[in-house]
Amino acid sequence: MPMTTANLNMATAGSSAPLLHEILTKVNNAKDKPAKIAVLKKNDSVPLRQVLKGAFDPNIKWDLPEGTPPYKENDAPAGTEHTTLFQEARRLWHFVEGADQKLSKTKKEMMFIQLLEGLHKDDAALMVAVKDKALNKKYKGLTDAVVKEAFGWNSDYKTS
């Protein structure tokens, strides 16, 4: 599905846009592979693609320790006082190995904790799973093959 103005701009859609964990829960709950692909295509956006690429592309190595960092979950109700992954996805490059050599490892870890603390608790847990390359364990049926087919990605995670 080609990117449209509507789904490209989900980052500016405010609280009307679903949180990424809500989209991936729909993928999890979809009955079969075609239904899972349809959910991803319907919710296609640059931030969703960035997060899923970070989760599945073996060439992306996160420059952060494995496991859940010590952060305080944001308990505010969904849609209030949160930042979203639609807004924050553009900053994820800071946490990729070799991408931001100006930041120390400690600073990257502190920034990642701040990111998690600003997100809805379920999106924060999603980001920890992305970083640990364990998103497919959190969301049943969200596989490398499903993601590649939904976005028309080849084995290098690029459009053919």
Regions found by a protein language model. Give the residues of each.
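N-terminal nucleic-acid-engaging modules of covalent nucleotidyltransferase systems
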Residues: 1-160
